[in-house]
Amino acid sequence: MAGQSSRFPNTRPKWMLTHPSTNRFMVTESILGLNLDFFDQIYFVCLQDHQDKYMFLDGFLRELEDVGLYEKSKVAFLPEKTRSQSETVYQLIKSENIEGFIFIKDSDGFFKCNLDDTKNQVAYFDLNDLDNINARTKSYLQLDVNNVVTNIVEKRVISSTFCVGGYGFEDALEFCDTYEKFKDLSQECYVSHIIFEMMLFGSSFYGTKTTQFKDWGTLTEWNKFKREHKCLFVDIDGTIVTNSSIHFPPYVGTGEPLQGNIDFLNELRDSDKVAIVLTTSRPESMREATIREMKRIGMGFDSLIMGLPHCERIVINDFANSNPYPSCRAINLPRNSDKLREFFE
């Protein structure tokens, strides 16, 4: 969070970008795959310059309260950019007098794992379980039969297991002592350098297997992730059920389910990547009847907009680097056709 976000040009700092399904900050989502009850305190380390420019703090604290993390969270501000994640952690430990076990988590990725031990550890995932990944941007580790890390290397593929941006250190002070050996180096000091140095002097690190890894490390990867998520505005009459009317038969509530469309839309929604907003020109007075009808035919949805004018509908949405063009599109489906799947790209 205190880095340069150089791989996210012309956007807010990457950790402030909005998650496409929850509308939370990227950084908030990045930690929700961990069993956070394991920790007594959660520190978010930011630049004072980011607060001065974006005034994010009040909104961030409200968000932390919404997800139940406010009481154990602290936002720490640094006066200037650090040269590495290691330096950021070092400065935090020193300024907050942190002792004992620490777990360092990248803000630009997500994974699930259960932490139940305060030993030295490295969270990892396997290349064979991913379809697409920029392998050259990762650090890699080798494990022996006892799950002990025997080697860790930055930006070079030495095995199929790579670090996912989660590192546990049994002793925060040992981390600092090791970092001080590197702090005057001209190049960036990666956390993997700290780990390798500690291993050379006798410390053991263990692998912590993770699931559901999501890589948000570059703007390209983030936008690719965002494109997997959709918000569909779906008209009811003629799309979900055969066209019905409040004025003449077939009356509202008597339309036949367009089962092919219903099944397809429910599949999308069940992926947890698609939100469905049903729209209709039916009057607000028919909301409860419409909800009962959707329940009866098994159509899942997230929101329902009633009372729209019966005319051409146009979606207007902004686009930007963080929400690239095209940020919206439309599908014109023949009335009462149940072939929506064929029109959906």
What spans do the regions from the language model cover?
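A short, conserved beta-strand element in the Rossmann-like catalytic core
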Residues: 51, 108-112, 239
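Conserved alpha/beta core of the MobA/IspD/sugar-nucleotide pyrophosphorylase nucleotidyltransferase superfamily
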Residues: 160-229
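Short catalytic helix/loop segments, enriched in acidic residues and glycine
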Residues: 11-31, 253-261
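Conserved N-terminal catalytic core of the sugar/cofactor nucleotidyltransferase
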Residues: 7, 21-100
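Conserved core of the sugar-phosphate nucleotidyltransferase
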Residues: 110-185
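N-terminal nucleotide-binding beta1-loop-alpha1 segment
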Residues: 1-11, 226-227, 231-237
